Amino acid sequence: IRNNMTNHRSIKRETGMGVEAQLDWKENMHYTLNTGEVIELNIFALVYSYSRYRINFISLTKKQGALFHYLDQAFEAAGGVPDILKTDNMKTVMDEARTEYSSGKVNAKFQQFANDYGFVVKPCIAGKPWSKGKVEAPMKLWDELYAYNGKLNYAQLNEKVMEINERNNCQVHSEIGKIPKLHIQKEKDFLSPL
């Protein structure tokens, strides 16, 4: 009997210091503020692959200007720029999706942004989210925000995101056995300067 199930598990590959960061959004979370207003929020997520250091920002938009702003802030917070930025096929990055049969086409503005910072854009193959598992795996952590539904204003919600992010960066990471906030200090020496 032949098994037609495809196993999507991949061999875990650790990247070197400063080599890669993975970018994604936790998208379209409906959240009720303490005023009763329902907002749709997104969480920008960047994970440095070696140290697993995470940088997250809350946003009401995923437009390209916001993406550039958050990447600027993230690179500054981490202390440098990785060689490669791994991303999915989000419209603010890609004009044409990368597939198994096509390399895709990076958006001209995003490519200029990448050139200015000196990193290579590496889009994942469409439909294969496990190829950027370092940023995908922690996304479920943001469901914790629903425990505060109706209790916080936008500024407090932003503070809560920063608090959760800091807590996660200060805990021993289960895969690498190190604390990301301390481990990024080693990785900084291998990141390109701002």
Locations of the language-model features?
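Short small-residue beta-strand/loop micro-motif enriched in glycine and branched aliphatics
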Residues: R52-F57, D95, K122
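Mobile-element integrase/transposase regions
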Residues: R2-R54, K62-H69, N115
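Active-site beta-loop-alpha junctions of metal-dependent nucleic acid enzymes
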Residues: N56-V81, S103
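Active-site-proximal acidic segments at structured loop/helix or strand boundaries
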Residues: M139-L194
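RNase H-like polynucleotidyl transferase catalytic core
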Residues: K109-Q111, N115-K132, K151
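Acidic/histidine-rich, metal-coordinating catalytic segments
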Residues: G80-S102
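RNase H-like two-metal-ion nuclease catalytic core shared by retroviral integrases
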Residues: D88, Y101, V121-D143
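Charged helix-capping and loop-helix junction motifs
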Residues: S102-A108
